[in-house]
Amino acid sequence: MLGAIKSEIRKIFTTKLWWGMGIGMAAFAFLLSMAAASLIGLTNPDGSSAGFDSMTGATGQMVYSAGLLGEFGSMSALFPLALGVLLITTEYRHKTATATYLATPRRWIVAVAKTLAVIVVGAVLGVVHVIASVGGGALVLTVFKDQPLLLGNSDVVATYGTSIVATVVWTLIGFGFGMLVRNQIAAVLIAVAFGFLGQLILNIAFAILGWTTAAKFIPGNLTTGMLVTADPTGGAVESGGDSYYFSWWLSALILIGYAAVLTVIGSILAGRKDIT
């Protein structure tokens, strides 16, 4: 088992794919955190508050995780999602999975090893995302806003951890989906299209229909529920408030559930297919 895990981890980190995705994700995380930080201290044309008067623990959570939030299109999350898809579909496309299955006849060992390797690379991307987000947000807050960074605030520190968990889960969702849809081009296009446009369309549709409970189950909204545990406007802006999100722990459980279902079903189907 240990040898299989090491082999799968080595297989990932000896390619350029993971760090290429990491660079792209870091760039989006940096820019979106800059955008979120730029909202701090803004006022409406009539001089009234736009909602983000100053840095608090909740606004810090928003700023330092902006790239993953549904409100920002979960743009950073698309990279671990696509990486998860590519890691497994590349093996199917180039038949490298065949050699793995022949070398390790017990397919459940292969499935566990691959899943753990995906968790490792997802965690690495999560750390990269946190660093890039802090860098982008801190730059704007320090240079343009003269606001405290609150990097050691307990709520903000908690968001560092949940950001890493969220990145791991999005990578696993892509991995599980890639095992179900083995055509690489189709899998990537469908996953990314849903991650961006699909979630946007669902949010709009559910808002029009007034289906606030259904909207809570959208992955991007679950991610927001995980990362931002209080109203970043401090109640200054009227909104749906908590009605749009589950509690952070329930959001995390449901999102992890999505990844678990896709990964388990994909692994079972992969274990039953003939080696080609």
Regions found by a protein language model. Give the residues of each.
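Secretory targeting signals
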Residues: W18, G22-A82, A111-R182, L200-A207, ...
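Helix-loop interface residues and adjacent transmembrane-helix termini in multi-pass membrane transporters
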Residues: E91, L180-V181, R272
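Central hydrophobic cores of alpha-helical transmembrane segments
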Residues: G22-A27, V188-G198, A215-I218
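Short loop-to-helix capping motifs
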Residues: T15-K16, P105-R107, R182-Q184
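Helix-capping/transition residues at the boundaries of transmembrane alpha-helices
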Residues: K11, T89, T100-L102, G174, ...
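Aromatic- and glycine-rich beta-strand/loop motifs that create alpha-glucan
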Residues: M1-A26
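Junction motif at the cytosolic side of a transmembrane helix
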Residues: L253-T276
